[in-house]
Each structure stands twice: as C-alpha cells, then as structure tokens.
Amino acid sequence: MLWRTTNIFPKRLCFGSQCNMLCRTTFALARLPGLIGRWFDERLALMRKGILGIAAVSVALLTSLTACGDDNKDSGGGGAKIGVILPDSKTSARWETADRKYLRAAFDAAGIKADIQNAQGDKNAFQTIADQMITNGASVLMITNLDSGTGKAVIQKAKSQGVTVIDYDRLTLGGGAPFYVSFDNVKVGKLMGDGLAKCLTDKKAVNPIVAYLNGGPTDNNATLFKNGYDGVLKPKFDSGEYAKGPDQAVPEWDNTKAGTIFEQMLTGTPNLGGVVAANDGLGNAAIAVLKKQKLNGQIPVTGQDATVQGLQNVLAGDQCMTVYKAIKLEADAGAKLAIALARGEKGEANSTVDDPEANAKVPAVLLEPKAIFKENVNDVVADGYVTKAELCTGEFAKLCADNGVR
C-alpha cells in the first residue's frame, strides 16, 4: 500500500542535458503511481525482495538527480557565481603570481565560488572564456581587457544576459561597465616622472635627453601612465631644462619588441640621459641593451609594478625606481565589489574616472601607488608582495643586506 499513498518522486528532477534520459524515465514512472501500486499489491507476497531492490534503485535515481541539480550551487554564496578573466602572463608577472593568488584567497574566504581564468593574450580565447562563464551561470564578470574592443564585446554580451561586469585594473573605453577597480594610474605615471627627475638630479645631469618607452598603444592604462609622467616632464622640456628624445609605444607591452625599439632609440640618440619605461618589463629590456654598451647604471631608467626583477634592478642601481601597487589591496577591493554585486547588494565606489569614448564618468574604486627607490625596497618585502627569499638570491643577497631588506 506504500506505493499508493507515498509519492517518492520529486516535482523537479532534472537540470541539464546529461540527465534527459534519466529524467524521462523517472517522470514516466511518476505518472503511473496507480498502475505501479496495483502491480505491487497483486504480487506483494512474491515480490518483497523486488520491492526492496526497486526502492534501492529509486534512492540511487534521486541521489543522481540531486547531483544534477546542484552542479552550479555555491557554498555560502547564495547561488551566485563570479567569473574572472585575467589578460595574459606576458605583459607582467603579476597576473599569475599575485592577482590570481589574492583573488582566489578573497573568494574562498567569503565562501563564494569563482572561476578564474587567463586568456594568455588571445582575443578569441578571451571571448570564449567569457561566453562559457555566462553559460555556466556567472552573475558577475570581472575582466582585465586585452584591449577596449575585446572588452566591449564581452560587456555587451554580458549585459544582454543580465550579467554585471567590473573592469579590473584596465578601463574598457566605451564599454559601459558599471564599475572600475584599479590604482590611480595617472598618479602611477606621475610617480615615474617625479622619480626620473629625482634620479637625474642625483646624477647632476645637465640638459639630459629623455626617451619615452611607453606601454601598449591599445591599453588605456598606458595612456594614463603617459599622461602622468608627461605632466611632470613636459614643463621641463618646454623650459629647456630637459630635451625631449625618442617617444614610442611598445605593442602589447612585449618585452622583446621593447628591446628592439630601445636599441634603435639608443643607436639614433647615443647621448640619451634618461628613460621613462612604462613598467619593469620594458625597463629591463632597456637595461639589457644598456648593459651591452656598458651604460647600465649611468642612464636612469624607470619602471613600475615592483616585480622581483624590477626590484633587483633597483638594488643593483640599473633601474632608478619602480612603483609599487599593492596588488593584494586591488584584488581584495575587486573581490569585495564582485561579491557584493553577486549577492544582490549595492556596489560602492570611492571615486570616478572619465571614459572619454563614452563621454561618461565611471564609478571607481581607486587605490594609491607608492614610489620605490633603493632605500625603501624593504617596504615591498615587509608588505608580503615579494619575499626576501625570492628577491635576495645570489649576488643580490649582499645588496639586500646593504639596503636594509629584512
């Protein structure tokens, strides 16, 4: 009689194509409780073992169906999912060594399921990853675009599916993302300009010719960095205190291309007095060229990102300074905003930035960068961004000790 009075079949059984056959079979059984009940009544005496066997199968069916339905459920996240797309591993080591690590820790601490992937500089892969994340149920995407065109395509697709997008570190011009999380990138550039001026003053340089080795031409951050350092150095060019030298962007922030470009700069202007390199990778490319001419340490070179390589170049005196951007703070801020939006809460910004292509102000969470010279390299180590063990290897052990790296 159990089969006449008890409905063991749930109302909602299937979630996904892999369950289709199982679901059709189970629903067919669910529609015939009376028939099943009569069948078992007539054969109750003979089929007790059979009933137990079918009951066991029913439990197995229900367990399998439950697993199908819970594939996308987040622990502690109210069902929300967050997708993060990092740009590459080539333009800077930070994306894999810092951003991924800190973002993962922040999401795990909040109990939010997040999918963090890297497009490895491939525009098609970037779009494919975004499509997969949306299909898999992400309610928030946090992207670091490869260029504004790639970013816009993802943002438009996400909007059409009701998915919120956060621009992380790089603003997608004309994209219309409702939030942007980054450092004050104009200030990053200003610190580079001020840093080069300090280094040239320390060297007592007279009318130095200054070259610009700018970042990728399609990266809005590269534009902001240049706005910052040009704001410091242009008045010096205009007054005649400094002379403006070669000025060239490096496609896709490619360090190999940067080396070639700078070699051509140095060949055409052998009396260069200083170099604004837009990050540590480009700076190291310039330093490698200068080493060939035994000019390293004589011509100040800037950078930013406070990479291990950049900090070692600073300690060695080959790079005059770098800019430390506390990536953990940026990752934590991005994760906090993404989690709030995924939970249906209102996101909070502390500033706005201009999107000249959209002629709009974008709500932003902006963080403060810090200039790093030889004397305060330890600040980066003390903050945990790099370790003494990875920085102070081989020949750099003594340089670390001499400069107070603990």
Which functions belong to the PLM regions below?
Residues C23, F27-T66:
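Sec-dependent bacterial lipoprotein signal peptides
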